């Protein structure tokens, strides 16, 4: 909403990176004159810049302000809370441990609010880090999670840390909406012969939804738009389920739903209610 309002205002502004991981949304904003730059130094001096939902490091914020750039901060509040947690941890002499994908923009931004963070992708990665040096199990560690990670990954790390570490504290910072969406997708996939996951292929939440659905459903399709859906190639199924990544706008979900509803398929009725809620 912030990006669209800014685009309509007509005032010069750029986005630092894609506002969300959805190419269709980014393209739509570009059509309205709001473009993305990839590096902070590409933001014109004295202009306005939108910080994306994944957040940016403290160094980026400081650099932009020093150049007189007006920051419109669209960082997810849940992500901002993690920035505060890791900062506070280091102020108390603790080492932040970030559970997430090391190259994900959100994780990079969180790490950028620390001086000496540790990033682990999962339980095995944590185990390897802990036992590289025996003294690490006695360090004061503060665990946080990438907001779009899964409960399975987080709980695996918590279990390992509680077993091996003598001074660890845990902040479950997985987004509640993300966790709920993942669990609903898992349950829905178990009842369907085919699951359609709608979202950008580069979105971590969308890819994780597809992986979760594949655990209980043998046929999973990942599509970005309705035109990606080749109905002639869809295997027969008594029931078809639809779910979507958090960054997928309601109008794209509706396009897919309408296209599939035009065919002779029974689509899980609860999805219609979910769609109505997402449009409100």
Regions picked out by a protein language model, each given a short descriptive name:
Residues 1-280:
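The feature marks the mature, well-folded catalytic cores of soluble enzymes
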């Amino acid at each position: 909403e912030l990006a669209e309002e800014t685009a309509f205002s007509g005032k010069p502004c750029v986005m630092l990176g894609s506002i969300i991981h959805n190419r269709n949304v980014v393209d739509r904003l570009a059509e309205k004159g709001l473009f993305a730059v990839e590096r902070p130094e590409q933001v014109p001096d004295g202009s306005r810049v939108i910080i994306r939902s994944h957040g940016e490091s403290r160094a980026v914020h400081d650099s932009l302000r020093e150049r007189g750039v007006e920051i419109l901060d669209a960082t997810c509040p849940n992500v901002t809370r993690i920035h505060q947690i890791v900062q506070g941890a280091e102020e108390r002499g603790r080492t932040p441990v970030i559970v997430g994908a090391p190259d994900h923009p959100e994780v990079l931004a969180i790490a950028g609010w620390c001086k000496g963070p540790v990033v682990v992708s999962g339980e095995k990665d944590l185990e390897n880090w802990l036992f590289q040096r025996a003294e690490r199990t006695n360090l004061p560690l503060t665990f946080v999670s990438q907001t779009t990670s899964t409960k399975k990954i987080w709980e695996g790390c918590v279990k390992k840390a509680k077993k091996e570490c003598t001074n660890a504290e845990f902040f479950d910072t997985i987004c509640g909406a993300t966790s709920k969406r993942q669990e609903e997708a898992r349950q829905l996939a178990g009842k369907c012969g085919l699951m359609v996951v709608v979202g950008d292929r580069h979105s971590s939440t969308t890819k994780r939804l597809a992986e979760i659905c594949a655990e209980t459903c043998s046929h999973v399709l990942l599509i970005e738009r309705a035109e990606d859906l080749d109905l002639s190639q869809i295997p027969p199924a008594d029931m078809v389920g639809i779910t979507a990544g958090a960054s997928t706008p309601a109008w794209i979900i509706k396009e897919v739903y309408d296209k599939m509803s035009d065919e002779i398929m029974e689509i899980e009725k609860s999805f219609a209610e979910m769609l109505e809620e997402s449009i409100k």
